[in-house]
């Protein structure tokens, strides 16, 4: 496992129902991320609440009021609640209204999330961003390493458990290669992708014109059912290792 363990022994109260809340972007969200695959593993006597939203950064998730909704949930049952926090994709440059400064804003925003979860009496868990699945000459391209490193530093500084999903997902995707990695997307890979993947490359893919704006499309970031199940299990395994109190609720 690649979970970086700052493990704290947290005991559930007798008869308590543990709750796991997912906070993040589209790579975690319903329909496009690993959240559904993760929640499918969580036992029915625990609660898995996916509050991740596509297109959000550490800044915009708070600015639009989504974080207020999370904090509202923590007004009850906080001591038996773990909040998994994963951002990075939309904090990168070139995303107006969402991008954050890597050296200052991004870590500051993560610190604030962690500290507010702790103040509410709940348990924050930082998660480094899921890798993209873009290859060049057989090598997976690391486009999120600095954001993963920033999350690691904040976790170490604040004594919060951290799941290094970035490292483990990169290792897994590199091992499977471009062809297999292309099957994890929301839609089947088009012919140009299949041809490129056979040579160890990930060609650019234009978004197809469609009458349905919500129709799933192929890309190297988002996940279909297969990808959600694969990475959801990875996160569940990391969480079970990092937070022993949750192991009985994460059958693997």
For each of these PLM feature ranges, what is it?
Residues 10, 43, 88:
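Residue-level marker of positions within ordered structural domains that often coincide
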Residues 13-14, 121:
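N-terminal regions of proteins, emphasizing targeting and processing segments when present
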Residues 68-252:
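Alpha-helical cap/lid subdomain in secreted, periplasmic
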Residues 58-62, 173-176:
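Short, solvent-exposed polar/charged micro-motifs at secondary-structure junctions
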Residues 15-60, 67-79, 83:
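Serine-esterase "nucleophile elbow" of acetyl-processing enzymes
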């Amino acid at each position: 496992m690649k979970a970086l363990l700052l493990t704290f022994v947290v005991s559930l109260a007798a008869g308590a129902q543990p709750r796991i809340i997912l906070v993040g972007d589209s790579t975690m969200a319903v329909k496009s991320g690993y959240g559904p695959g993760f929640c499918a593993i969580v036992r029915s006597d625990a609660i898995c609440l996916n509050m991740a939203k596509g297109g959000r950064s550490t800044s915009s998730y708070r600015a639009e009021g989504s974080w207020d909704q999370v904090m509202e949930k923590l007004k009850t049952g906080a001591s038996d609640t773990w909040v998994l926090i994963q951002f990075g994709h939309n904090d990168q440059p070139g995303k107006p209204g969402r991008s954050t400064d890597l050296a200052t804003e991004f870590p500051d925003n993560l610190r604030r999330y962690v500290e507010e979860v702790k103040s509410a009496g709940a348990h924050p868990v930082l998660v480094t961003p899921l890798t993209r699945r873009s290859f060049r000459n057989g090598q997976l391209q690391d486009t999120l390493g600095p954001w993963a490193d920033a999350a690691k530093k904040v976790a170490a500084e604040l004594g919060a458990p951290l799941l290094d999903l970035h490292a483990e997902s990169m290792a897994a995707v590199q091992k499977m290669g471009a062809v297999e990695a292309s099957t994890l997307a929301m839609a089947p890979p088009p012919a140009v992708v299949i041809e490129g993947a056979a040579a160890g490359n990930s060609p650019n893919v234009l978004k197809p014109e469609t009458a349905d704006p919500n129709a799933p499309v192929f890309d190297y970031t988002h996940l279909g059912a297969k990808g959600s199940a694969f990475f959801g299990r990875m996160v569940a395994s990391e969480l079970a290792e990092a937070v022993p109190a949750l192991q009985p609720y994460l059958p693997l």
